[in-house]
Amino acid sequence: MMTKHERTYTTKANFMLHGGDYNPDQWLDRPDILADDIKLMKLSHTNTFSVGIFAWSALEPEEGVYNFEWLDKVIDDIYSIDGRVILATPSGARPAWMSQKYPEVLRVNASRVKQLHGGRHNHCFTSEVYRDKTQQINRLLAERYGNHPALLMWHISNEYSGECHCDKCQHAFRSWLREKYNDDLKALNDAWWGPFWSHTFSDWSQIESPSPYGESMVHGLNLDWRRFVTDQTISFFENEIVPIKELTPNIPITTNFMADTHELIPFQALDYSKFAKHLDVISWDAYPAWHNDWESTADLAMRVGFIDDLYRSLKQQPFLLMESTPSAVNWHPVNKAKRPGMHLLASMQMVAHGSDSVLYFQWRKSRGSSEKFHGAVVDHDNSSENRVFQEVAKVGQTLEKLSDVVGTNRPADVAILYDWESNWAINDAQGFGLETKRYPQTLVQHYRTFWEQDIPVDVITKEKDFSAYKLLIVPMLYLVSEETIARLKSFVAGGGTLVMTYISGLVNEHDLTYMGGWHNDLQEIFGMKPLETDTLYPKDKNYVKYRNQSYELKDYATVLELNTANVEGHYEDDFYANTPALTSHKFENGQAFYIGGRLEDQFHRDFYQELINQLSLEPVVAVKHGRGVSVQVRQASEKDFIFVMNFTEEKQPVAFESLVTDLITGEEINGELTLEKYEVRIVEKTK
């Protein structure tokens, strides 16, 4: 949690970055197009471009034969219009000559089939050849451009993902295991519960990565493999940046994180909490499916806010929106265009939650291949007059007036704990409901009340300092180590308020269950223990009575055994009717609540409202508004920057309690104003 309002600049720029992925290597035979790009950059009010992301074959068309002249001109031309460059390393897609000459760089899938050259992100992270080749090209880039005044940041590779199961990776995995378990095979067998199905190993060489044609049922193995994949990816990244850190130590480094699935949950395949420690700046690629047919615009905006707050909290500093689309993408099931006004609103939401940039994929639509219809600033018409280009220019004009916002953050008294390892483990668990676990979505459900009331939230990982917060919410923390339990206990003992839910605290860091049903320290904190969890069919319902109101329950209901806890709510139906569903417990100087079932949104609003009142949790700036309007604040020592955003399809009245000034128009506002559909107003308030 921030306690002061010092600015943290992600780069040496003191302005909002606006631009995106620029692929001039696709147009080297069209100098007229490249000349048009520079003209259009000025017209679109863009200032920063990520260059070279997939340009390896243009930089090194044959092994040891380099062509940097085109990149020299591109960077010089961008700088000539006072633009800046985020220079990428090209490891995300290697040239064909390399795959042909060095087949060891090709990835092997879990079925042990070696992939052909093609696509992207299909390399072996362990391959010494690929690591050497990557360092070579990166060194040349750093030597040539490290002192160029346009260079703002390094963009290392692109959207790291995937895994390899080749012989080299098997050897690396076994070495990783030997280090983790101190070369003690018995310790590994114990951690993986080896006697199950006679899966005790007698030699390290017998261990293979999970495979549909081999082992997939040993959950300790699966969990350690995912940890290894994260560590090996980070190792590859660290190898990439050796020459860059050596030659350009003052240029910040990032790589672009992602979201997952159409529901925009945190990317699941890599533990970003580990990866974040190796980056100077967090950046991520955001592609919400605006105007979809399964949720309201406000509900989607809330989910965007959650993942923004997670990625911002990874380093407790502003992040960068590295990729977004000016309108439609090309890979959603339905690629709907952003409606007029939505692009500005969506972009300003990212800034409101902590981004110091609005960057796009892509600057110009490619003419061929799979991304030729992906949204871009410049369409195939090469025009500055179409709707999308004009909306991009409006975003740029707005960002030009937000330089004072750059580097600011905001404090939070509320934290929600998100854990990648627990997500892996619960998804692997053969129990509960296979389709209804929905761990990330459950955290968003608990986030809702605070987002609706404009109360800042940090979405933190288990390594963070819990004592910085008044309220810590820990939904569905299936996997929890004794170390984390001890820190939760210390948090409550020190005066904190802890909320935990069903399917929490069931296994340790090896995915082994705690004997006795629940860890003794958890029983002490909560004054009760869970006895069994009832998993409901999709059409099943139960109800919980809380404060004389009935709330619908779906999916899960946990039967609880009281010790010293108080009953705050009870089940109304089934064999556990009239038994505790919600408990509270005073523990030393703090308090702990346990929610036994998955309850409707209105329950969370009412339950958390009591805690909001009790703990004096408040918005940074009070603005009166209805549901569907979000107010987010970024704070400097002398001013608050207030983003008031209408995520509804109707006009919405809002009211300020004190005088504010519109940052874009300079208008002074004292009292009420009306937001149009999808409108955003950005105001400042002097402290």
Where are the regions a protein language model picked out?
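Carbohydrate-binding surfaces of carbohydrate-active enzymes
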Residues: I207, D280, W284-K687
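Aromatic-lined substrate-binding rim segments of carbohydrate-active enzymes
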Residues: A35-L43, S50-V113, E240-L247
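Short, well-ordered coil/turn segments that N-cap beta-strands
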Residues: N14-H18, H45-N47, Y79-V85, N147-L152, ...
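Short, acidic/polar
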Residues: W27-K42, Q136, L264-F275, R339-S347
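Conserved, mostly hydrophobic/aromatic
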Residues: G20, M41, F49, I78, ...
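N-terminal carbohydrate-binding accessory modules
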Residues: M1-T48, P61, D76, R84, ...
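Polysaccharide-binding and catalytic clefts of secreted carbohydrate-active enzymes
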Residues: S99-K101, S111-F306
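The substrate-binding groove and active-site-proximal loops of carbohydrate-active enzymes
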Residues: H18-L28, F54-E69, L116-K133, S157-C164, ...
